């Protein structure tokens, strides 16, 4: 009785709903699990326990869509035939140990990247391309034409609804594309418009500051209270450092442990500068 009670507390703490969800899933989903993550905080293991995802052996290939950094193009509606023949699979591993993964011994015929999307999981909320396994599988299903099943999968997580609140506009754009090239073009346009909007907001903010007059004569704010709430008031688009994203061209679905999260936070630099660098990096990468 003791361990069972402990698991319930751990699941509640990590944002997982109870075990009263359906134990099977209507579409075939799989993962290669490398055991890097905390089992109680791992979305892939959670889905495996619920019977939604099956675990693949190292050396076993997958005939459906494989979300992997070995992919050359993003997943698109054109991959629906592959999905219908085999489903979707992901790699369950830690960002911090990505170099340990034997990618030559896993994968399949339809290896794909993920286009620009923003994580909503508790570990990497608001970080582009930092999707975990559940989010990556949901994104794949949504893009190839199974939005209802994507939502059904994310219903297994207390925070799952936020993935669509954050990404629904982009997911709808991608789902209406014809193929990978179309998705790359839409992704590039979206990022360019996002950067332009960001720069416009920055310029307006600067104009407001100068129109306010001499700020030395204005009353000062209580900086201690502002600082204490800085984590809560961060923008959902708060970015990790460019160095922490240098190894992932688009996305690999993973679940991070506390050590990885600490490293990412330690590498954070000026938010404005990181925003510009990362958006430009992604825009330029679609030209190559």
UniProtKB/Swiss-Prot annotation:
Keyword presence, Nucleus? yes
Q: A Pfam family name for this chain? A: Ribo_biogen_C
| Top-rank taxon, per record | Eukaryota
**One of the record's GO molecular function terms:** 18S rRNA aminocarboxypropyltransferase activity
Bias (Polar residues) ranges: 209-221
GO annotation, cellular component aspect: cytoplasm; nucleus
Q: Where is this region: Disordered?
A: 209-267
The biological process GO terms on file are: enzyme-directed rRNA pseudouridine synthesis; maturation of SSU-rRNA
HAMAP family with a match to the protein in the record: TSR3 (MF_01116)
Q: In which family does this protein belong, per the annotation?
A: Belongs to the TDD superfamily. TSR3 family.
In Swiss-Prot or TrEMBL terms, this protein is called 18S rRNA aminocarboxypropyltransferase
This protein's encoding gene? tsr3
């Amino acid at each position: 009785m003791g361990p069972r009670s402990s698991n319930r507390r751990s699941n509640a703490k990590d944002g997982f709903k109870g075990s009263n969800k359906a134990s099977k899933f209507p579409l075939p989903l799989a993962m290669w699990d490398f055991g890097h993550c905390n089992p109680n905080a791992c979305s892939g293991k959670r889905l495996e326990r619920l019977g939604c995802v099956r675990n693949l052996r190292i050396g076993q290939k997958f005939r459906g869509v494989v979300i992997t950094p070995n992919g050359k193009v993003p997943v698109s509606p054109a991959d629906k035939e592959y999905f219908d023949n085999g489903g979707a699979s992901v790699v369950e591993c830690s960002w911090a140990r990505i170099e340990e993964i034997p990618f030559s011994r896993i994968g399949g015929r339809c290896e794909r990247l993920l286009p620009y999307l923003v994580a909503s999981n508790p570990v990497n909320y608001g970080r582009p391309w930092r999707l975990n396994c559940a989010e990556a599988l949901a994104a794949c299903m949504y893009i190839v034409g199974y939005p209802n099943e994507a939502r059904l999968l994310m219903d297994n997580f207390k925070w799952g609804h936020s993935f669509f609140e954050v990404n629904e506009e982009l997911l709808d754009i991608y789902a209406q594309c014809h193929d990978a090239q179309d998705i790359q073009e839409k992704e590039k346009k979206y990022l360019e418009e996002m950067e332009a909007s960001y720069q416009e907001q920055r310029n307006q903010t600067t104009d407001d500051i100068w129109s306010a007059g001499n700020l030395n004569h204005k009353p000062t704010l209580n900086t201690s209270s502002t600082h204490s709430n800085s984590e809560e008031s961060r923008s959902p688009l708060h970015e990790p450092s460019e160095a922490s994203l240098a190894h992932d061209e688009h996305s690999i679905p993973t679940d991070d442990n506390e050590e990885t999260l600490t490293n990412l936070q330690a590498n954070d630099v000026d938010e404005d500068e990181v925003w510009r660098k990362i958006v430009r990096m992604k825009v330029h990468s679609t030209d190559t």
